[in-house]
Amino acid sequence: MLRLLLLIAGIALAACEQPMSPASGTIRVDQRMAAAPDPGFARALEVRPFDFPRDHGAHPDYATEWWYFTGNLRDAGGGLFGYQLTLFRVGLRPGDPIPDSRWRARQLYMGHLAISDIGAAMHYREERFGRAAAGLAGAAMDPLHVWLGPWSIRGADQGLFPLRLSAWTEDIALDLSIGPGSKPLVAQGENGLSRKSAAPGNASYYYSFTRLPTGG
């Protein structure tokens, strides 16, 4: 297969600086995902140079980031398919102290998986949540590895490509190898600083790779 693929890796930060409610013994993932970030997190305020391969990985000083893949593929029989795999990281509190329990987490992860079978007019989707504790979810470098349960994004031992995407559910599965493309990196907005409004910090650092050869 060789079709269009768009890869986006970025950091998105909310502009609101309202403090979160005091910590309690329980947390609802949906409420935390919708809450304003702790004001102690770093914010996207000005243009900064990207530092690769380090910037392909996680940035726990920031509240939110994601690794986003979407593409159009054709199988050996000519059938058309579309897919999306996105892993989000959401910080609960700034800083990264050594936890006193392997189950204690300062990060939450959310995943979206979708596959469209164009010929059959069918669309399949799944969503996952997990904490960055006890090996359930997380992000690492050298090489790049972002995972949420059995869903994962893996980079090459040297550099980023080839990338390996792997995710499955009871109904669908995705297993793709992504090679480097011929087009240069695309930096959104002002040299990678993508402003969402005039409010300071309501912005993200955002870059993309497009038209990458993909097979699987």
Q: Which stretches of residues belong to each language-model region?
A:
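Bacterial N-terminal signal peptides
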Residues: 5-14
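Targeting-peptide/extracellular-domain and disordered-appendage signature
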Residues: 15-216
